Amino acid sequence: MSMLKDPSQKYRPFPAINLPDRTWPSKTITEVPIWCSSDLRDGNQSLIEPMDAAKKMRFFKTLVQVGLKQIEVAFPSASDTDFNFVRELIEGNHIPDDVTIQVLTQAREDLITRTFESLRGAKKAIVHVYNATAPSFRRIVFNQDKQGVVDIATNAAKLIRKLAAEQPDTQWSFQYSPEIFSSTELEFSVEVCNAVIDVWQPTPEHKIILNLPATVECATPNVYADQIEWFGRHVNRRDSVIISLHTHNDRGTGVAATELGLMAGADRVEGCLFGNGERTGNVDLVTLALNMYTQGLHPQLDFSDIDAVRKVVEECNQLPVHPRHPYVGDLVHTAFSGSHQDAIRKGFAQQKEDAIWEVPYLPIDPADIGRDYEAVIRVNSQSGKGGITFLLEQEYGISLPRRMQIEFSQVVQGETDRLGLEMTAQQIYSLLENEYLKATSPYALASHRLQEENGTSAVDLEVTFDGEKQHWRGIGKGPLEALVAALPVKAEIMDYHEHAIGAGANARAAAYIEIRLEGQRPLHGIGIDENITTASFRALFSALNRAVTQAEAKAA
């Protein structure tokens, strides 16, 4: 079977929401929502191999460390594993005083009763009950009319209120979800929720949570935002209700739908770290939080060591995080393109500490989430001098002069073309070392002695030429001019740069020289030494040897 030529014969577009006076498009997110992780429930139930108790405990502690204050930990009536995990959290005193656990139950008497048994002794808990409300579920799955759906919800709400009253030592919160909210008629969603409100009688001091799931994402994010704004206008006791969002990513816009839903007036978000969950996953709490962070709003969640969080999530879920996943993927802060690398390098060069972040192609400073800069620029056959220069600067403190950047990039390009692979900073440095720092043939500097008097420099050098020792002597207005005068070939210094590598007692000097031998194109050399004069001499010998070697190769 192939794709239909006319998909309208099989699929219908989602109907638009009649909300001509919608206000959310002109709003921005200025307040942090209440965050609730569903990793241990919605995320866990979507895994090929659900987490065992040890993994769930490890995950729970990670969520606490990140700063989650509401954590949906289990579906305790669904399995003994989930039930026992809730008991271990409570009896083992693993729940901090500022954290509230949440558990899910279907709207059935036996399951609700079992759920309350799991929570006995908890200091605080959210009981989350749900039933499906969408027309297709009413008709196909449950064979219920609208009143039947309302009765299921209100009967469950009454039982929850009764059982909570029997355990007064626990600080209870109630949550109701009209499952498949995003595909339910808005008027009916409000009708069901208002019926639950009438049972639970919330107040501004003791609010209930109405969770509005896009259980299956079936429209563009603006439609979900319209639904949230419409619902907020029409639900009873809005000041006593926390509107919660629970989006999925079936169309790839779960994050966008949630952000627009917050602009439309929602107060709370349920989701999973890195977007785990049924089918295409729940909304990614990390992306949401760091999107806020990069807009100057701290999400009150701490991802300062995002790779440590990822490690726990990957090992517990037994699912890898995609290398292109926002903020956390291995490649999200990486540039291979030469033009991108050049822009990033220039951005880092001008970026001042504590200033507004303006580095091109990087929406967040990787250091803020515990990343180093090594992976920001990586070199392959598409890379240019900017990326190569950046890696040498960041990893080895070597700042190549501009013309030398061009020269060395051709060396690297030749190697990447030959290998067809990415090159690491270490491999690039090895190339630099072999091309420049180990260029000690045919002339090898053994030792030198410098005398300076009345503005004149005299240098005596011991040099090995093709294995034979030679003595050179030169005089000039400075050490380099004296060295050039001592050379057995005619050479001209075209450019010279130097800088320190490191600081303090362990600092070394790096010198870069561009020379031109008579009848040849200019070439560069590098020298590194604790002494700046020695470094400059080594740089000149490096350039000299490269020039002589290339001339001989050309002649051959």
Swiss-Prot record:
Positions of Mg(2+) binding: 42, 246, 248, 282
Residues in the signal sequence: none
Domain of life: Bacteria
Single Gene Ontology MF annotation: acetyl-CoA C-acetyltransferase activity
Keywords from the UniProt entry: Amino-acid biosynthesis, Branched-chain amino acid biosynthesis, Cytoplasm, Leucine biosynthesis, Magnesium, Metal-binding, Transferase
Residue stretches in coiled coil: none
The keyword Transferase belongs to this UniProt entry's keyword annotation: yes
One Gene Ontology term from the biological process aspect of the record: L-leucine biosynthetic process
Domain Pyruvate carboxyltransferase residues, every copy: 33-307
Catalytic activity: 3-methyl-2-oxobutanoate + acetyl-CoA + H2O = (2S)-2-isopropylmalate + CoA + H(+)
HAMAP family: LeuA_type2
Functional summary from the UniProt entry: Catalyzes the condensation of the acetyl group of acetyl-CoA with 3-methyl-2-oxobutanoate (2-ketoisovalerate) to form 3-carboxy-3-hydroxy-4-methylpentanoate (2-isopropylmalate).
Assembly mode: Homodimer.
Similarity remark: Belongs to the alpha-IPM synthase/homocitrate synthase family. LeuA type 2 subfamily.
Protein name in UniProt: 2-isopropylmalate synthase
Record organism: Pseudomonas paraeruginosa (strain DSM 24068 / PA7) (Pseudomonas aeruginosa (strain PA7))
